Amino acid sequence: MAVTTACTSAASAPQVKPGGRSFTVAAAGDVLIHPELVDQAAKDAKKTGEGEAGLDFGPLLAGIKPVISKADLAICHMETPVGKPRGPFEGYPEFLVPPQILTTLKGVGYDTCSTASNHTYDHGLGAVRRTLNAMDKAGLGHTGSARTPEEAEKINIRDVNGVKVAHLSFSWMSFLNPTPEKEKWAFNQIDTDAIKDAEARAREKGAEVVILSVHWGLEHYNEPSIPQLELAERLTTETGIDLVIGHHAHVVQPIQKVNGTWVAYSLGNQVARHSSPTGLTEEGAIGWFEFRETTDGWDVSARYATTLVDIPPEAEAGEKPPAGAVEDHRVVDVRRALDAPGDLSEERLARYRLAADRTRGFLYNRGAPGGDGLKELTLERD
């Protein structure tokens, strides 16, 4: 039996409840710490004297703090397991990244992270446990993977401005290391019935809003796949989930309302440095969703902020980078950079404009402007 979703169309939206509660959610794309970003953190630690064990990821992500820190609930997607502070670390295809990134994620304002992905089990159950222990130490909430079968049954519910908000996380199957049958509980694999069950348990525990992070789709495609579209249809007709946040494609895909519920198919990469950057893999989006209590559930509006990972050029042997070239990997709040360019070169500004234009186009590609109401975020960035 279909369940009516709490998010209704603009034409039939109920009135905002006088004195009703409200809160904002910021969500971003994959956190994927490639070796070049570890090298950058080592370089930055030498300059700042901050961080742990010679790694400081703070400068890398500082550019998004003015947005992320302003949300009432900020959700990241921690795609990979972490190793020990001094390593060893690994990149693609079996990631093992510095736990120091978790402290930085907390520092820029993230509250909780989804952890179910095709890389969750890259280094087995021991690495899953190490990752969740490190997230606990950093003060980050987590959902999608578990240290024990008992923990796998727990629901991540947070009080956000007096509203009980549950966060769920599910993924397609593991990448190179299939999860042993006896450890299937270690991370949530996509199954519509399992998602329904998790939502039901969240509601039983008092959740008033349920947000689902889902790791799905085809990598490097800016359009959702048929299985994504089919699952989005089922989620928005057979459950009461209030917001769907997608990851995995490593490029931006549309945000649209499906049967009255916002679905962000892919927010691209929050931070990554692929071995062969395409330009699209460096462009991402922060989804910004405002929930307002109405006389009949929740009205949800959607905004977005474009991000870009600045990457230093790779000079040919014996050559020096051109004057004014990017010197460090940095995650850029594109709108903020365009509004206050300072002494940025025309080449840099042109790159930022391209990121803004392309991201807007991909996000709008399934009709989100107009009737759906998706707009660029206007927010005072301190």
Describe the role of every protein-language-model region:
Residues 7-382:
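Acidic, metal/ion-coordinating pockets
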